[in-house]
Amino acid sequence: LILNKYTELGYSFYICWSYYKLLFMKSIFKFFILFSVVFDVNSQNLKSPSDFLGYDIGTQFSRHSQVVDYFNHVSEEMDKNTLLINYGKTYERRPLFYAVISSQANIAEIENIRLNNLSALDFNDNRINDKAIVWLSYSVHGNESSSTEASMQTIYELLTKRSDLLENTVVIIDPCLNPDGRDRYANWYNQTTTIPYNTNKISMEHKEPWPGGRANHYLFDLNRDWAWITQVESQQRLNEYQKWMPHVHVDFHEQGINEPYYFAPAAEPYHEVITKWQRDFQFMIGKNNAKYFDENGWLYFTKEIFDLLYPSYGDTYPTYLGAIGMTYEQAGGGVAGLGILNSEGKNLTLVDRVKHHTVAGISTVEISSANSEKLNTEFINFFKNKDDNTTYIMNGDKDKIDQLSRFLKNHKIDFYSSDDQKLSAYSYNKNKTINYSISTADLIIPNYQPKGKLVDVFMERTTKLSDSMTYDITAWSLPFVYGVNGYSTSKKIELKKYKEKKVENLVDKKAIAYAGI
């Protein structure tokens, strides 16, 4: 008997099957409707920065406590898409934190994504990660304050209007690297400004007094501290950065009020360790940013002023760790306030400054998402491709060597000791090759390790410049920074675990005791 709808039995079977198929399809439909409603309800519960703060974003300077409150709100309402990480406090006890956002599926697997990405630093680990990791850093200079406002708008738009980008991308947003400096500026401005604000640059609200909000509590420029990590904000942030090792890092800044917006590609000189891919992708990011700026009729420039050389900036340090590191500069700064007339007579408003940073940030996430696989492949290649083997040898006073070893530990750079031996080595102090005898007390740093390119940058004696016009510092060699004797050799040395010498405070039992009155 053939079961088909033209036989009595087949027809009955067909009717039953059609009925249950209809029930099944209705159930599936209801499930998707329910899922969509749940997601939509979560999105609807998430307030925009303007709705949450009670004023349109960019019409006031938000205090750091308000920024904290908004990110807590985002974390609570979008908990399946967001992780909020508190990583420390400033000298003035303001919280330091960042948000990790992505799709629900990615957040559920976020630890695996993080560890898979870090496997690029292990020569023997071949785990594969196909998610792009983009880190956005705001307001390292406190009075370049529009970017913190933009961080709130950026996280809101990524979770609502551009959630598609989060399917294959993890975005890390640190809304304020320098809360002490930023609150110093915001509090001064809020106390000084008129209502409505005055756009005349000679008015008091455009005359930020010393010490200003640029620096942190100890008036240290945190954008010169990525390598040296002398400040507590930098120390805590570096520890978190090394847990993620992003593929793209953007450092948001502000510049003079008459300048158009600046984004990548950077100006020459580029350091020689920067790869062709890192150069090329800067151009790709710049073109994508330019597309949106052109659509809005916003002025911008590239390849001028801001180079990629000195290793202690928020663009170069990530670059020497395999990322596409970039500085974005918006017109503004401490002089701009809520609005100011520039030399062309145009009103530069905080509202517009926030828009520019927001669009540039989301554009960067967009192009990174579109190239997530290539970003991962090239990130792995950055750490595994090493053309030369150089070993650096350090000796000197114990306290100076100890300081150097702490520096290396903080950057997770491997260092060792070795047995006594003689070899030919280049002397940093004498600037020539000499015969040198290694001792067991010497500290030895090979560049044939995952962070070997960063080692080469830190150790170079003479900076190689493709252009004599540089933005800032041109010398930073570690032997001279720490006042130790430095040597380098191309010979591979048998390495042993480094053992720090313990300090022995000996008491002379025969010493004559005396008392002073």
Task: Indicate residue ranges for each PLM-predicted region.
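Hydrophobic, small-residue-rich alpha-helical packing segments that form membrane-like cores
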Residues: 174-292
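Sec-dependent signal peptide recognition
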Residues: 26-34
